[in-house]
C-alpha cells in the first residue's frame, strides 16, 4: 500500500527544505541560503507517533514572474497537491506577511485538500505567538509557530497533521531495484525519467543544472518495483560553484552509492567526454552495476553503419566498462526507452548472482592450463590454490595464492577476463581479492572445498 503524501508549499527561501529535513529527520533536501534551491518535487519518508507518510518538498512558488523555471515550479507544486492528502503552507515569521503569501493562500483556498499553516523561523517561543498572529488574516485557520532549525512547535503541527491522513493497514516492505540516473549536465536525465514513468516528475529545461536534488520516484513494471533516482549533472570541479550545485553533485555521488544499478546517460551529440570517463571510473570505484544509455539518438544523422560505428567509438573511450550493456534511445520521442528496463533487470540479476566454488575452480583450472602464472627473477612461480565467491553486489571472488606479489597486473586482468568469458556477469563489475595463503593451510582446508586447482 502506498504511503500517504504531505505536500510542503510556500514562497522561495521560507525554509521549506529545512522543515522537510526536520520532519524526515534527515538532511537529504538541500538547504542553502539562496532562493530557488529546490526546483523539482522531492520525496522523503517521515514518521510521527505510529504513522508513516511521505513528505514532498516543492520549489518556491512565485505567481507574478514567468522567468524560466517559475512556471515549471508552479506545475510541479500543483502535481504535488494532486497526489497529496494534506498540505503544509510554510510562511516566514521573521519577514512577516507578504503579497506573495497572500497570492499563494488565495490559490490554496481553491484546492480540495486540507491546508495547515506553518509559520517558520519562530525561534523564540514567546515572540513566535506574536509573529504567527499576523497570518490569521490569510483565512487558512490557526497558524502554527514553528522552528524548522530547532524543532520548536513541530510536534503540535504533526499531531494535527496525522488526523488528516487516510487510515492505513500494515505497510509491507517491497523488494526494489534502486537505479541512479547519472550523467553530465543537460544530457537528458530528467527527460529520460519522465519518459520512463509517463509523467512530468522532474523539471525539464535546456539550461544546465536544472536538477539539483537527487529525486526518488518509485514505479512498478511487470510486477517489479523500481526506485529511480534522478541526480544533478556531474561536471568538472573547476566549473562547480560552492553552494547548491556543489551540494547537489555530492548528493549525486551519494545516489550512486545508494543504487544497485547506474543508468549512465551520455549525450549522443557530444560523444564520450573526459568527464564521462571520470564518472564511469566513479561507478567502478563504488562497485555498481551499469547500463550505458546514449540519449538524443534522434538528433544524429544515420546510415546502416552509424550505430555500429558509434558503439565502437563509445566502447573505445569507455574500455574499462566494456562489461556494461549499451542502448541508443531518444527521451524526446520515447524510442527504445521501454527497452532500458530489460537491460536494468539483467544487470541487477548479474549484480547479485552467486556462483558455486566448484564452478569457479573449473574456470581457474581451464585458465591456468592455457596460461600458467608467471615466474619471477628468482625462479619462483605464482600458484593459485583455489577461488571462492565471498560476496555479491558486486560479485567478489577471493583467490588464495602462495604470494599475491607474484601476480602482475596483466595476469590479474587475464584471470578476470576468463571469469567474464565463462561466467558472464554482464552489466556488473567483478572484484578479485588476491589472498596469500601457505600450502599447509590449504591442505588443512581441502576437505571444505568442492574442487581444488
From Swiss-Prot:
Superkingdom per UniProt: Bacteria
The keyword RNA-binding is annotated on this UniProt entry: no
InterPro entries: AAA+_ATPase, G_ENGA, GTP-bd, GTPase_Der, KH_dom-like, KH_dom-like_a/b, P-loop_NTPase, Small_GTP-bd
One Pfam family this sequence matches: MMR_HSR1
Binding site for GTP 1: 10-17, 57-61, 120-123
Keywords tagged on the record: GTP-binding, Nucleotide-binding, Repeat, Ribosome biogenesis
Domain KH-like: 353-438
Any one Gene Ontology BP term: ribosome biogenesis
Ranges of residues in domain EngA-type G: 4-169, 177-352
Molecular function terms, GO-annotated: ATP hydrolysis activity; GTP binding; ribosome binding
UniProt-annotated binding residues for GTP 2: 183-190, 230-234, 295-298
Function: GTPase that plays an essential role in the late steps of ribosome biogenesis.
Family that this chain belongs to: Belongs to the TRAFAC class TrmE-Era-EngA-EngB-Septin-like GTPase superfamily. EngA (Der) GTPase family.
Known partners and oligomeric status: Associates with the 50S ribosomal subunit.
Protein name (record): GTPase Der
Organism of this sequence: Trichodesmium erythraeum (strain IMS101)
Lineage, broadest ranks: Bacteria, Bacillati, Cyanobacteriota, Cyanophyceae, Oscillatoriophycideae
